[in-house]
């Protein structure tokens, strides 16, 4: 079952990316280093739930 998630910047708290993930196979929270346009650098982005 795919669920919609957002990736929130840990520095500026903006939700910069949205994607889907398989909730059955990936139970842990997703953490990725992605580019933050507000900070203009690569920062850690953590998974949050989006309203679907």
UniProtKB/Swiss-Prot annotation:
InterPro entries: Ribosomal_bL33 (IPR001705), Ribosomal_bL33_CS (IPR018264), Ribosomal_bL33_sf (IPR038584), Ribosomal_zn-bd (IPR011332)
Top-level taxon: Bacteria
Annotated GO biological process: translation
Pfam family, one: Ribosomal_L33
TM region(s), chain numbering: none
GO molecular function: structural constituent of ribosome
Cleavable signal peptide: none
Record keywords, A-Z: Ribonucleoprotein, Ribosomal protein
GO cellular component terms listed in the entry, alphabetical order: cytoplasm; ribonucleoprotein complex; ribosome
Keyword Ribosomal protein: yes
Sequence similarity: Belongs to the bacterial ribosomal protein bL33 family.
Name by which UniProt lists this protein: Large ribosomal subunit protein bL33
Species of provenance: Helicobacter pylori (strain ATCC 700392 / 26695) (Campylobacter pylori)
Gene encoding the protein: rpmG
């Amino acid at each position: 079952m795919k669920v919609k998630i957002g990736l929130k910047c840990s520095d500026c708290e903006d939700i910069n990316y949205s994607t889907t993930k398989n909730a059955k196979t990936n139970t842990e929270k997703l953490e990725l280093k992605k580019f933050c346009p507000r900070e203009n650098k690569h920062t850690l982005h953590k998974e949050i739930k989006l309203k679907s």
